[in-house]
Amino acid sequence: MNYPQLPVCRRPKVAILATGDELVFPGSTPGHGQIVYSNGYALHALARSEGAETIDLGIAADTLGSTAAGIRRARESGADILVTTGGASVGDHDLVQQALRDEGIAMAFWKIAMRPGKPMMHGRLGAMRVIGLPGNPVSSYVCAFLFMVPLIRALSGRSEIHHRHERAVLGKDVGANDMRADYLRARLEERDDGALVAIPVNHQDSSLLANLAAAQALLVRAPFAPRAEAGTPCEVLRLPA
């Protein structure tokens, strides 16, 4: 005690921009081809749980002008991190990458060998870091957990920024994996001998938000991992409670 000065870090500012004409806010009635917007609420909660301040940029329409306007608002707000959700793939309405390039992004990568979350991107617009997340709810959250959270921790000055891998055993058989790292949503149980058991949820579709909500962890499967039977050792990452 009795230190005249202490090193401190400012809380990072995270701006969150959703994209897509198909999105409507909760409480609205979805029209044909529309869905209720959920990603932003999960991302705001996740960022705040790590000590960040968040800025809600709303939903950009599927036009370059609307998407670019949202990106510029993020820069004007002084955000340290811009997180976009949706529009990160290569369809006619996936305009985030083009809007970011038009604004001058230095792209670090686009597309990663993991499931869920292949069409993720990352780069920098000046001092602002940019993370472009997929639009599917599970993909968006898993990528934010794996990439946004460590970035927030690093900008907060923490020495421990990565998620801790825990040892467990499989609670049921899992099939062989392909060339992508797989992050299976799983429930956790504890055996009488104290061993942690990871039980993958039955359906791993990246649109099934309820199955993510029921999971306590991500079961990590390496690329080309062979088929594994129940009782095989494995590694998990605990999700926020």
Regions found by a protein language model. Give the residues of each.
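Glycine-rich nucleotide phosphate-binding loop and flanking beta-alpha elements
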Residues: 5, 23, 89-90, 227
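Short glycine/serine/threonine-rich phosphate/pyrophosphate-binding segments
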Residues: 25-26, 90-94, 141
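Flexible glycine/proline-rich
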Residues: 99-241
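Glycine-rich beta-strand-to-loop/alpha-helix junction loops that act as flexible
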Residues: 19-20, 82-96, 134
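Phosphate-binding glycine-rich loops and their immediate beta-loop-alpha structural context
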Residues: 1-84
